[in-house]
């Protein structure tokens, strides 16, 4: 950016007002693209944090200021994950400004994101999950709508590997009973079709036949899962249901994402194609799915070391 154009972002010439206006437009653009509310909120928080820093230090939006801001966060104890998230937010914002002709160039183009030490996801054993499903099935009696709903929810999360937010958003019209397919709306409002097996099919049918009518009200939405008050089940409630059920697994404390991790890993353990698993999980990049191959290899190594006489 040239010296004359830098003044556009100088705090002494109304630059902060321009940046705040740009941020408002950027957030509107994210919303229009169907970016999740949580991502919008995180971007808003991180970029506002930068704007406060620029205001406090009377700096312009340039590479040096961005590095100073990230250094300050690091010195204050910010983790690599925090720095990576904030860097991503800023790079998206400044790239959008440049593409929208609100800036002559992108000051974050040379800004590097810290490499994260990515831990392998936690995976519940098939044996411990079988015990969970057996227990839940015994509680899912015709006169127990809560038990039927809980069983249906957990069966579907594991059967399909879907995100808990995707499950919460499912409507009755998203179910193709004949072909045993679910139409799931994922990140960025992208839709995909997910197959489910006979056990999930049974749990869906029992919930719809016996459980859902018991809690349904005239004002109830068309959502597949309803709370005891006849409302769409929220992500928080589903998280609590899964967490309470998984306490008895080999992992102890775990949430819905553990079921997603477990589904992906067990699919690969049983020979599923990596690209098929990518499609099932709704990952934009195959690299995101590849972490499960590492989990599968580690599980293979562990089994070998425990079972082979010459390990």
Predicted segments, located by residue:
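Conserved catalytic core of the tyrosine transesterase superfamily
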Residues: 2-311
